[in-house]
A protein has these predicted regions:
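Nuclease catalytic cores
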Residues: 272-275, 279, 283, 287, ...
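Active-site metal-binding core of divalent-cation-utilizing nuclease and nuclease-like domains
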Residues: 21-44, 325-361
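Terminal, charged accessory segments of proteins
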Residues: 1-265, 278-296, 300, 472-630, ...
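Short beta-strand-centered aromatic/proline hotspots
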Residues: 643
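Acidic, metal/cofactor-coordinating or nucleic-acid-engaging core segments within structured domains
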Residues: 379-458, 462-463
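Conserved catalytic cores of phosphodiester-cleaving nucleases, focusing on short active-site segments
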Residues: 323, 345-347, 351, 364-376
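Surface-exposed intrinsically disordered loops and tails
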Residues: 210, 411-427, 461-488
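Short, contiguous acidic/charged loop-to-helix segments that flank catalytic cores in large enzymes
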Residues: 306-310, 331-338, 354, 373-385, ...
């Protein structure tokens, strides 16, 4: 197998030229070439498969060349097997000779298995996006007894096993039928000599007749090994290969022994028991599975490939499938915006500031963007600016949805207003209720990929904050985990509930886990991870809000209209600082910046609001119910408020004496 890396700039050497000849790479005037694909292809001239790995496995390294520093691309977290070099470049491992010289057995094993995950992901992407132009495919290598070549990739072997199962059901059925023919006939000689006879009405009766002796059959042993391999591939990689014959397969513990070498040993022991072409071919591919160095016969009559051009689109599709809402379920103009911009990921989830115990939860849009970079790459300012533009377009779209005057709206938008499943989402309250014109917070996020140094697919933490430095150290949270890099854009810094205040956090996802989860397509696994990720985004952004702002709850004094009048008359002072996020719309949320420069301004505003509202003395934790505290404050002022769990009874009281009697009973 030959190895290339996506978008790496190769010097045009003999090895590079031979390897990339089939796929027309991009070149420049300095005789450097790069390949903008991910996947693999078979080269008839090389008689080998070429595998193109994603650039996420590379990182930049600065080295000294003739006294000058230079940045080069190297394999991330991989050291040479031998020699004085401290790193491996993509050029080092193009050919099998270089791979054997530089790569450890562990890394070679990783590449073999990684090829299958890439194959599965590309197949799933093509199936779920039938009209895509991002995937190029021609018939894949199949095992056979025709022209032989040296290709022996794990991918070749796995696909050959699956293809053999699809095309040879008649072979299995015919062989099994012949093997079992006559197995239920009674062996009378052994029955008469071994079994006890009873005489009933002159007729001999044998309660335990002996069937014909079953001898060990090597065809069935080969079938058991073959179907056990298929079951292993189905479980590990998420293939859907049917196993239509009810053999007792090898247990997991037993199969592990086969993987560790016993499989090759046992197959060698029974090698010369087979004579038919199909039985020999089945033995070949089973042995090749257990011995990846075995020379597998593969048809080489035509060029074969499975390639993804612009793999960032595939990565985006994988992420959206795992955390987002499908674009076809999102109203027109919301994700595919009118100015030509397209939001990578969007979904509706619980709003940030509300009572988490409320049965009726208010939702808000979450907007995300995938960033398919090499390991360690940083966001540029253009990406951040574009994400804010997406969010502003969403805000305006939502406001338009609830406008009373629809004379200038297109028919498409009018239809959205009638049928939109997102219509329950209100970024801004109704005009008569929203006296302060506060806007709900729209969370935004970036997702980029990383790979663990030990290249594990499933880890305890498959999504984490993108690391950033402060005072020369990586910022960690109270649990010792990396905090996500968070950007806050605003026009006025002390206005959390303003349409121009946008919060954007950056996370890293385990690329191998995303590949694993997407390729397996197991609904339960995907649903659990989707819920966990969405909750993590919400919790992390809440922490950011609590770090930057003190959140208070407010309840109007008697006469709510008086409080509203104050807000209307002091509109500029409270603009962007108050919002009504709770089911109980009497209760307001007040957000005040923690920056020292606003300390006096915030104290004056809070004191002034205290003349018209009951305000919690201390900031409240986001997600908690402030009603008990607020109504307790109201009760201290002589006004009784009772929370009823089973409804409210309304009645008339004729006089004070009757009311005192009701109070004495203590049952109201």
């Amino acid at each position: 197998m030959r190895i290339l890396f996506e978008e790496h700039q190769y010097n045009y050497t003999k090895d590079v030229g031979e390897t990339i000849k089939e796929i027309f790479p991009l070149g420049d005037v300095d005789r450097k070439v790069s390949v903008s694909y991910v996947g693999y292809f078979y080269s008839p001239e090389l008689k080998d498969c070429v595998f193109i790995l994603p650039k996420v496995l590379l990182c930049d390294r600065t080295i000294l060349i003739e006294g000058h520093s230079q940045t080069i691309e190297v394999l991330s977290d991989v050291k040479p097997l031998k020699g004085d070099k401290e790193y491996i470049t993509p050029e080092d491992i193009i050919t099998p000779k270089g791979q054997n010289a530089y790569l450890t057995e562990e890394y070679k094993k990783f590449i073999y298995e990684f090829s299958v995950w890439i194959y599965r992901a590309l197949r799933v992407f093509k199936k779920t996006n039938p009209g895509t132009k991002a995937i190029y495919e021609r018939q894949l290598p199949q095992s056979g007894r025709g022209k032989r070549h040296e290709a022996n990739t794990y991918l070749d072997i796995v696909l050959s096993l699956i293809k053999f199962n699809q095309e040879n059901q008649d072979f299995f059925l015919f062989t099994i039928k012949n093997l079992h023919a006559g197995m239920n006939k009674i062996n009378w000689t052994r029955t008469l000599s071994k079994s006890q006879c009873f005489i009933q009405k002159g007729t001999p009766i044998y309660l335990n007749p002996v069937n014909k002796k079953r001898i060990v059959n090597f065809d069935e042993e080969l079938f058991v090994i073959f179907f056990s391999i298929l079951a292993y591939l189905n479980d590990k990689y998420g293939f859907r290969t049917p196993i239509n014959f009810r053999y007792e397969l090898l247990s997991k513990q037993r199969f592990d022994q086969y993987l560790k070498g016993y499989g090759m040993l046992r197959l060698r022991q029974i090698r010369y028991k087979y004579f038919s072409d199909r039985a020999l071919r089945l033995w070949d591919i089973c042995f090749a599975f257990f011995d990846s160095a075995y020379k597998l016969a593969v048809n080489a009559d035509q060029k074969e490939f499975l390639l993804a051009k612009s793999f960032e689109h595939v990565f985006e599709g994988m992420i959206d499938n795992l955390i987002g809402t499908p674009h076809q379920q999102i109203p027109k103009g919301l994700a595919d915006q009118k100015d030509g911009k397209r939001v990578d990921h969007m979904y509706a989830y619980d709003a940030l500031i509300q009572n988490d115990e409320d049965t009726k939860k208010e939702e808000i849009y979450y907007i995300g963007d995938s960033k398919y970079y090499k390991a360690g790459n940083k966001l540029d300012s253009n990406s951040v600016y574009k994400q804010y533009t997406y969010a502003r377009n969403v805000i305006q779209w939502n406001i338009n949805l609830f406008l009373n005057d629809d004379k200038e709206l297109t028919e498409e938008v009018k239809e959205d207003r009638k049928n939109d499943a997102f219509k329950t989402i209100r970024i801004r309250r109704e005009e008569e209720d929203n006296v302060a014109e506060g806007y709900n917070i729209i969370p935004n996020f970036f997702l980029s990929a990383f790979v663990y140094p030990d290249r594990r697919y499933v880890a305890k933490e498959n999504i984490k904050g993108h690391p950033y430095m402060e005072n020369g150290e990586v910022v960690l949270d109270d649990k010792g985990k990396t905090r996500p890099k968070t950007y806050i854009s605003y026009q006025f810094p002390n206005r959390l509930f303003d349409r121009d205040t946008l919060i954007l956090s950056h996370y890293d996802v385990n690329f191998l886990y995303v590949l694993y989860l997407y390729a397996r397509q197991k609904a339960g696994e995907k649903a659990r991870w989707k819920n966990a990720v969405r909750q993590k985004f919400r919790d992390e952004i809440r922490k950011v809000v609590e770090e930057k702002f003190d959140i208070y709850a407010m309840l109007p004094h008697d006469g709510e209209d008086v409080a509203k009048d104050y807000i209307s008359q002091n509109f500029q002072r409270v603009l962007g600082k108050i919002f009504t996020p709770y089911n109980n719309e009497e209760i307001y949320s007040l957000a005040l910046s923690k920056e020292e420069r606003f300390r006096n301004e915030n104290k004056e505003l809070k004191d002034e609001l205290g003349k018209y509202f009951y305000i919690t003395d201390a900031p409240i934790a986001i997600g908690t119910d402030p009603s008990d505290v607020l109504y307790a404050m109201k009760n201290e002022k002589g006004i009784t408020h009772i929370k009823h769990k089973k409804g409210i009874l309304i009645g008339l009281v004729p006089d004070d004496a009757h009311w005192k009697w009701i109070e004495s009973q203590g049952k109201y």
